[in-house]
């Protein structure tokens, strides 16, 4: 009985070894032994490489607001005078209801309809002039691009033009002004603002200055919408920048 059992054990050993070998070959079919997995007469598998996807251009989104006309008559600056207790001007209340709206924008542009300066006394219709406190209130709301080209640009003649230019030049460096040019030689000096890698050119024109001609001794002048050749040249110049 012992010998028969030994024969059975030996026979099982012979049977198991081929089974293990077959199992090992079978495992190669799953990818571990790919070089020997091609069936006779069949074409070898060809690996097709997929083309690299083209890189997509980065998209920059800027939120822009435009406001006009910021025209300050005597009723408004007298209220501001009263709020300041008779000393100076406080225009804060004028914008407090709309100020939160402008916080949602990256760039805020405004047409400043009246001259802004502390060098000249404030005045109302028909020739406007507004205290400097108004300009500082405009800045505090978030307006940074100031257009000065409109029908009231010449209300105070050459003196008013020079004074309002000095006021805005003294404001923080992030203020951009547009619309007044120091003669024809300055028409190519187009204000450019860069924001998050985007370059923006600002051009501003007016249809009229209420019948007032450009003062002969003015430090700067507007460009009228009728000057189409000049406008076209500025557009082309701005596009190239």
Enumerate the language-model features and the residues they cover.
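C-terminal motif of bacterial Sec signal peptides marking the signal peptidase cleavage site
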Residues: 21-24
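Bacterial N-terminal signal peptides that target proteins for export
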Residues: 2-14
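Acidic, metal/ion-coordinating pockets
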Residues: 26-33, 40-241
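Short intrinsically disordered, low-complexity coil segments enriched in acidic
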Residues: 1-3, 31-32
């Amino acid at each position: 009985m012992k010998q028969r059992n030994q024969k059975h054990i030996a026979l099982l050993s012979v049977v198991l070894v081929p089974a293990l070998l077959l199992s090992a070959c079978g495992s190669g079919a799953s990818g571990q032994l790919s070089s020997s997995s091609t069936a006779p007469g069949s074409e070898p598998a060809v690996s097709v490489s997929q083309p690299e996807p083209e890189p997509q251009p980065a998209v920059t989104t800027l939120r822009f607001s435009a406001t006009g006309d910021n025209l300050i008559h005597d009723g408004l600056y007298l209220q501001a005078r009263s709020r300041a207790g008779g000393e100076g001007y406080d225009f804060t209340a004028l914008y407090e209801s709309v100020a939160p709206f402008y916080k949602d924008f990256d760039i805020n542009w405004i047409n400043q309809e009246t001259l802004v300066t502390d060098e000249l006394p404030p005045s109302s219709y028909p020739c406007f002039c507004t205290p400097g406190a108004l300009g500082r209130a405009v800045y505090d709301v978030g307006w940074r691009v100031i257009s000065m080209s409109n029908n009231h640009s010449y209300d105070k003649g050459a003196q008013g033009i020079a004074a309002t230019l000095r006021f805005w030049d003294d404001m923080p460096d992030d203020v951009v002004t547009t619309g007044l040019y120091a003669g024809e030689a300055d028409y190519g000096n187009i204000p450019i603002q860069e924001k998050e890698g985007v370059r923006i050119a600002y051009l501003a024109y007016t249809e009229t200055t209420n019948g007032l001609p450009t003062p002969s001794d003015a430090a700067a002048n507007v460009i009228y919408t009728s000057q189409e050749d000049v406008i076209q040249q500025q557009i082309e110049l701005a596009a190239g920048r």
